[in-house]
A protein has these predicted regions:
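Histidine-acidic metal/acid-base catalytic patches
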Residues: 1-6, 13-31, 63-65, 92-97, ...
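Catalytic-core regions built around general acid/base machinery
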Residues: 50-64, 115-123, 177, 225-229
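Glycine-rich, proline-tolerant flexible connector loops at the mouths of alpha/beta enzymes
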Residues: 33-57
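Short coil/turn segments at secondary-structure junctions
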Residues: 42, 104, 134, 207-210, ...
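Alpha-helix N-cap and loop-to-helix initiation/capping positions
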Residues: 46-54, 81-88, 108-115, 139-142, ...
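Active-site beta-loop-alpha junctions enriched in small/polar residues
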Residues: 8-12, 35-39, 74-77, 105-108, ...
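Hydrophobic residues within beta-strands of alpha/beta enzymes
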Residues: 32-33, 70, 101-103, 131, ...
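Active-site acidic/histidine proton-transfer and metal-coordination neighborhood
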Residues: 19, 61-68, 76-161, 170, ...
Length: 272
């Protein structure tokens, strides 16, 4: 099986899903992700669960392009997490034929987070969807070790960890930490690049992650070392937002370069 490369929604968040499917297909990608709920209050999201016309158009574009929907973003688990408002989100993810739902954590209580994550997994299981916990250095679940504890404690067959190359580096994670993560936890991973040293402030860290990432191979991250420790056939989500470069090049060219760079960097990387 050939490794698949999909465009993450953050790479071209302004494009509604039908247009992103078409642009990603022209760029040589295998699929896309869809952000149906925002990463932060007021952020961009394409709420297909509330827009039947946009959902129909997205499904039509998916069929016309032959592309897949890799993942749906995002569920945020806070101290007062309530699963019920997400039911329509989950149903729409299944209707799109997605494989994974991205989860982030804002609750400092790990036991409570693990219990909530288990409920998310249980709700997704009938749809054949996995729940994948993405650690981010500015959230309550800031690194690989914390995500591993939560996913292990939840003990759900469809629970996993999403490794983002930038977050892995900025959280100070070490490559050897991946050796103890069960391969079954690692359903897919996100690729990008950036300077070896990250911004000094929290605000700078968040801005770089959300608005200004580099194409794979043009920064200082050890991408070959990282992906050599991830499952060889795990799909790749290309997450390369750039508020400065993408508008100059145009979406088609930016996505084309992102796909080509990702394939080039991972060519010959065996994985495990």
């Amino acid at each position: 099986m050939t490794r698949q490369f999909c465009i993450g929604p953050l790479t071209a968040l302004a494009l509604p899903p039908p247009r992103l499917l078409e642009a990603a297909a022209r760029a040589g990608a295998d699929g896309i992700g869809v952000r149906m709920l925002p990463a932060a209050p007021g952020g961009i999201a394409h709420r297909l669960m509330d827009d039947a016309a946009l959902l129909r158009e997205t499904l039509a574009a998916k069929a016309a392009t032959g592309m897949r929907i890799l993942d749906i973003e995002m569920v945020r688990i806070g101290p007062a997490f309530d699963l019920e408002p997400y039911r329509g989100f989950f149903e729409t993810a299944a209707a799109l034929g997605a494989a994974h739902v991205l989860v982030a954590g804002d609750d400092p209580d790990e036991a409570r987070t693990a219990a909530a994550f288990a409920r998310v997994c249980e709700a997704l299981r009938p749809y054949g969807l996995s729940a994948d916990f993405e650690f981010m250095p500015w959230t309550a679940v800031r690194d690989l070790a914390a995500a591993k504890r939560i996913v292990a404690a939840a003990a759900q067959v469809n629970g996993g960890i999403l490794v983002d190359a930038l977050h892995f580096a900025r959280a100070g994670c070490q490559l050897h930490e991946l050796d103890d993560v069960p391969p079954g936890f690692l359903h897919y991973a996100q690729i990008c690049d950036g300077p070896l040293r990250g911004p000094a402030t929290l605000e700078g860290l968040i801005h770089a992650a959300r608005c200004e990432r580099g194409l794979p191979g043009e920064g200082g991250l050890d991408l070959k070392g990282l992906f050599d420790r991830l499952p060889a056939q795990a799909p790749i989500c290309i997450e390369t937002p750039s508020d400065t470069r993408a508008p100059v090049l145009g979406w088609d060219e930016w996505l084309r370069q992102a796909v080509a760079a990702s394939r080039r960097v991972l060519r010959g990387v065996a994985g495990r």
